[in-house]
Amino acid sequence: MGYSCRNSEPEAPKIDEEQLKESLIRVNKTLAHEENLAIDRYTERRGLKMERTGTGLRYLILKEGQGSKALPGMSVTVNYRIELLDGTFCYSSDSLGSKTFEVDQDQIESGIHEGIKLLSKGAKAKFILPSHLAHGLLGDEDKIPAKSTVVYDIEVIELTNNP
């Protein structure tokens, strides 16, 4: 089909931004609800009685530690095992070594920063991070797919104040 100088290409239909926004919010709520149901099924199948924070982080403290809990700016060293909800193994300190980071400072999952503040030196816990607290829409572009819920088994090895 040809176009003359007087006839321009047909215009694409205009999108009502408010309708688009409402539609995206609806879809996001549905996806978040489905993710929460999957986490609930995971915990029920395994008989885990986990606590839930306001952000959606699930946690179970398996062993209490000693001393004060981690605070923002403290240096924390952890041993860990990371898997997906379906049990797919992703990473562990057994193969990669312990991880050291500063609470609320380093670029790690926000759910880890939130959960680590519940623990002190020597503590062991299981965290379930919904995708928005883990690697989000993109995953880690390696072993953790996009929009994946992540399960952490974590142990605090060292907890120190930074100068």
Regions found by a protein language model. Give the residues of each.
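Cross-family detector of peptidyl-prolyl cis-trans isomerase
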Residues: 5-163
